[in-house]
From Swiss-Prot:
One of its GO terms (cellular component) is cytoplasm. The gene is queF. SUPFAM superfamilies: Tetrahydrobiopterin biosynthesis enzymes-like (SSF55620). It catalyses: 7-aminomethyl-7-carbaguanine + 2 NADP(+) = 7-cyano-7-deazaguanine + 2 NADPH + 3 H(+). One of its GO terms (biological process) is queuosine biosynthetic process. Keywords: Cytoplasm, NADP, Oxidoreductase, Queuosine biosynthesis. This is NADPH-dependent 7-cyano-7-deazaguanine reductase. NCBIfam families: QueF. The active site is at residues 184, 191. Substrate binds at residues 83-85, 223-224. It is found in: Cytoplasm.
Length: 276
């Protein structure tokens, strides 16, 4: 478990406040998890973002009338901290009985508080329900590998040695799977996700990628670190011309987390999937 997570609200009973309380946000440093992967802030081999979507966001107008919206929060992947998810939920719930002059006043407040907690500029967008409905449900790009006939016997730890490629054949390819699962390192609760691998390089064997994805099934780690581990394992194997790895996780507590890691600039396509 991440040492800082032991002091977070995750896995503990909590009092739900309904008036604005920014101190509820609980930062967790990324550095210890980077160190586990042999990384440090000054030598990250990727660019990226973590996109959080909040479906339980409400506040009051000056008239006392409630408003609801869907919040989108984009956190840089090189920010010093992430925000522990339950503390994020508690913070957002503290807005429920708080008056804001208008939507922009709330957006600025959210951006200020989350930027302070993560140590980096956080972009905030508040979307109306009509906008979200119009956007609809998206399908992942590329080839789905989930129906491949493979025999799998490893579920405990991510196993990079399962991955195989053909160095003699270079391709542009997008593969995806809906079978990503890991466990919260604090509570042990399952984290369900869908994974996309978009690359240019030696042809990755799809069946080996599927076995590798499933090897995370009993692994305990945060969403962000799982995606970073996958990115690094593929980067080492393929030495690709370009590589983007991202996952869209099923929401819990009204929040879903969607980490993107890439060798190039990231433009996150933040459209929800059927399970989100």
């Amino acid at each position: 478990m991440h040492p800082a997570a032991e002091d977070s609200p995750l896995g503990k009973s909590s009092e739900y406040l309904d008036t604005y309380t920014p101190s509820l946000l609980f930062p967790i440093p990324r550095a210890p998890k980077w160190a586990e992967l042999g990384l440090a802030a000054e030598n990250l081999p990727y660019r990226g973002v973590d996109v959080w979507n909040c479906y339980e966001l409400s506040w009051l107008l000056p008239s006392g009338k409630p408003v609801v919206a869907v919040g989108e929060f984009v956190i840089p992947a090189d920010s010093p901290n992430i925000v522990e998810s339950k503390s994020f939920k508690l913070y957002l719930n503290s807005l429920n009985q708080t008056v804001f002059a208008d939507r922009e006043a709330l957006r600025q407040t959210l951006a200020r508080d989350l930027s302070a907690a993560t140590g980096a500029p956080v972009a905030v967008r508040l979307r109306s329900l009509g906008e979200v409905q119009e956007q609809g449900v998206a399908a992942l790009p590329g080839q789905c590998i989930d129906e491949l006939d493979v025999t799998i016997g490893r579920y405990g730890q991510p196993s990079a040695e399962l991955l195989r490629c053909d160095p003699a054949r270079r391709v542009e390819q997008v593969l995806h799977s809906h079978l990503l699962k890991s466990n919260c390192p604090v509570t042990g609760q399952p984290d369900w996700g869908s994974l996309v691998v978009d690359y240019h390089g030696p042809a990755l064997d799809p069946a080996s990628l599927l076995a590798y994805v499933v090897s995370f099934r009993q692994h305990a780690d945060f969403h962000e670190q799982c995606v970073e581990r996958i990115f690094l394992d593929l980067l080492r194997l393929l030495e690709p011309g370009r590589l983007t790895v991202y996952a869209r996780y099923v929401r819990r507590g009204g929040l879903d987390i969607n980490p993107w890691r890439s060798t190039g600039a990231v433009v996150a396509d933040n459209r929800r999937l059927a399970r989100q």
